[in-house]
């Protein structure tokens, strides 16, 4: 029990540290793409900028609207960050802290609960703008979870298990990225929408609006939402690396599994940032059209194909008990 608590605490601290420096990497990346330096004053080449930002936010006085629901107003950001950090307990690096065989189902269940944090924050603010932003965010998140779920089902048919360890064993010789690249492309776009990133950042719309569901938040509670968003970005790209980019270990290269997964997840994270610098924002109707009229029929067709191939060739992948 003590070992598990210690492991969880270390994992949470490492994730929060990674999130802090991801914000600096994003600002640096966007800066160089716009022919400027980015943060370069606090510390060597701006390395301490995330620490300064965090200290500034958490030292601010907590304020909220007079007519807001104070308990739910504070609970919502705490819930968002707790759910985002709890997902990391399921990632095998090379062993996960939580040993369950239905990892993917639990991941989908926990990520679906983040909808309640968004909706609760918008409703508790007692602001019509925050509530409209929350409803818009919830509709977007729920829509793209349908796509993510169908893609996961297609891959589960190939592996024969809901465990992430099964994905590692199945991809010993061939990555799913090569054999199932349409699924990988749709998965990547769906993770962009699920994490509310450009070009699907209709939730916030920073260049047009002040913010979305968190428009009334400032200081510490706002920082918790910020940490939850970037933790989800790191998690989704790590999950993508495990599901589509092969096993954690390597028979040919003598490198640690954690280094291997970082080498595969980092280019995906940089691609997230690159997309923010390059693409304009979708209209909301285009966002929904892409999901319900493009991704959903294609996902259902691929799911039917995978299912029929599995039955035709004598069953799905070998179940990993």
UniProtKB/Swiss-Prot annotation:
InterPro entries on file: NADH_UbQ_OxRdtase_su1/FPO, NADH_UbQ_OxRdtase_su1_CS
A single GO BP: aerobic respiration
CC terms in the record's Gene Ontology section: mitochondrial inner membrane
Transmembrane segments: 2-22, 71-91, 100-120, 148-168, 173-193, 224-244, 255-275, 295-315
Pfam families: NADHdh
Membrane topology: Multi-pass membrane protein
Span of the signal peptide: none
Source species, domain of life: Eukaryota
Catalytic activity: a ubiquinone + NADH + 5 H(+)(in) = a ubiquinol + NAD(+) + 4 H(+)(out)
Subcellular location: Mitochondrion inner membrane
EC number, as in UniProt: 7.1.1.2
GO molecular function: NADH dehydrogenase (ubiquinone) activity
Uppermost EC category: translocase
Broad class of the protein's primary localization: mitochondrion
Function: Core subunit of the mitochondrial membrane respiratory chain NADH dehydrogenase (Complex I) that is believed to belong to the minimal assembly required for catalysis. Complex I functions in the transfer of electrons from NADH to the respiratory chain. The immediate electron acceptor for the enzyme is believed to be ubiquinone.
Family of this protein: Belongs to the complex I subunit 1 family.
Name listed for the protein in its UniProt record: NADH-ubiquinone oxidoreductase chain 1
Source organism per UniProt: Petromyzon marinus
């Amino acid at each position: 029990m003590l070992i598990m608590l210690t492991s969880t605490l270390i994992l949470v601290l490492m994730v929060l540290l990674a999130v802090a420096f991801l914000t600096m990497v994003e600002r640096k990346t966007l800066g160089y793409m716009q022919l400027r330096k980015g943060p370069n004053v606090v510390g060597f080449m701006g390395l301490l900028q995330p620490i300064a930002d965090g200290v500034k936010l958490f030292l601010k006085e907590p304020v909220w609207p007079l007519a807001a629901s104070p308990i739910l107003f504070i609970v919502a950001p705490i819930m968002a960050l707790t759910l985002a950090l709890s997902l990391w307990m399921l990632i095998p690096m090379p062993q996960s802290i939580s040993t369950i065989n239905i990892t993917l189902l639990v991941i989908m269940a926990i990520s679906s609960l983040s909808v309640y944090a968004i909706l609760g924050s918008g409703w508790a603010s007692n602001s019509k703008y925050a509530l409209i932003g929350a409803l818009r965010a919830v509709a977007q998140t729920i829509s793209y979870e349908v796509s993510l779920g169908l893609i996961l089902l297609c891959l589960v048919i190939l592996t024969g298990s809901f465990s992430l360890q099964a994905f590692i064993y199945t991809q010993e010789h061939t990555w799913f990225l090569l054999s199932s690249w349409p699924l990988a492309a749709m998965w990547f776009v769906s993770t962009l929408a699920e994490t509310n990133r450009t070009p699907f950042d209709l939730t916030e719309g920073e260049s047009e609006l002040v913010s979305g569901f968190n428009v009334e938040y400032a200081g510490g509670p706002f920082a918790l939402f910020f940490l939850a968003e970037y933790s989800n970005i790191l998690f989704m790209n790590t999950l993508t690396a495990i599901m589509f980019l092969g096993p954690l270990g390597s028979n040919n290269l003598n490198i640690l599994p954690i280094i291997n997964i970082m080498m595969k997840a980092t280019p995906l994270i940089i691609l997230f940032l690159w997309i923010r610098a390059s693409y304009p924002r979708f209209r909301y109707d285009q966002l929904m059209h892409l999901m319900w009229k493009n991704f959903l029929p294609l996902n259902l067709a691929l799911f039917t194909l995978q299912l029929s191939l599995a039955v035709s060739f004598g069953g799905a992948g070998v179940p990993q008990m």
